A protein has these predicted regions:
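Adenosine-cofactor binding site in Rossmann-like domains, unifying the SAM/SAH pocket
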Residues: 10-40, 143-144, 149-164
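S-adenosyl-L-methionine-dependent methyltransferase catalytic module, highlighting the catalytic core
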Residues: 59-66, 70-72, 76-180
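A conserved beta-strand element that flanks and buttresses the S-adenosyl-L-methionine
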Residues: 47
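Anionic group-transfer/hydrolysis microenvironments
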Residues: 7, 23, 82
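Conserved class I S-adenosyl-L-methionine
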Residues: 2-9
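Local beta-strand N-terminus motif with an aromatic residue
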Residues: 43-44
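Short catalytic micro-motifs in class I SAM-dependent methyltransferases
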Residues: 50-54
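GHKL-family ATP-binding catalytic core of two-component histidine kinases
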Residues: 37-39, 56, 123
Length: 181
């Protein structure tokens, strides 16, 4: 089974995953998540946690087309992005302050000697329509708790606020969506 962890950063999911990120980490197999060096229809699973928001709406369409190209028919794409709707509800209801959601909404990460920021944000409807428009199907939310890899590796698909980091009492602020080719 060919499994890609795209935009993985320092997170190493183990030897049975291929890790791709522009960063400089010893476990990386490749650098470019926008131009994958794989044959058409050769990948079973793509996982990308809090990475597509770093592309603008035109760039992300090209990236998702590239990812779809390498997925096998029936292959699964799992994406996690900051959940605009969840954070907006928390803020509107006075559960969090603006300072609590600025980071997850706008991002800020050093990359290649400069700081990069999120270029867009998503709610379920906008992410659904984006994926549907690019011929992905069986689009639905997923619960990170249902997958061993996510239970064993703490990543942004498990981002919670109110209280921050509390997976039992907090509100999930990661929009976790899966789709199939």
């Amino acid at each position: 089974m060919v499994k890609l962890n795209l935009g993985c950063g320092w997170r190493n999911f183990g030897k049975d995953w291929i890790h791709i990120d522009r960063g400089d980490y010893p476990h990386l197999d490749y650098k470019d998540i926008t131009n994958l060096e794989f044959e058409d229809n050769s990948v079973d699973l793509i996982y990308a946690s809090h990475v597509i928001e770093y592309f603008d709406i035109n760039e992300v369409k090209e990236v998702l087309r590239e990812w779809r190209r390498v997925l096998k028919p029936g292959g699964e794409l799992r994406v996690a992005v900051p959940d605009f709707e969840a954070m907006n509800i928390l803020y509107h209801n006075g559960k969090v302050k603006l300072k609590d959601i600025i980071g997850p909404l706008y991002g800020r990460m050093p990359m290649g000697g400069k700081m990069i920021y999120h270029k867009t944000t998503y709610d379920y409807e906008s992410l659904y329509l984006l994926l549907y428009g690019l011929a992905y199907n069986e689009i639905e939310r997923y619960d990170w708790r249902h997958y061993d890899v996510h239970r064993q590796n703490d990543d942004h698909s498990q981002a919670y606020l109110n209280p921050k980091g509390d997976k039992d009492k907090g509100t999930l602020i990661s929009l976790n969506v899966r789709a199939r080719k």
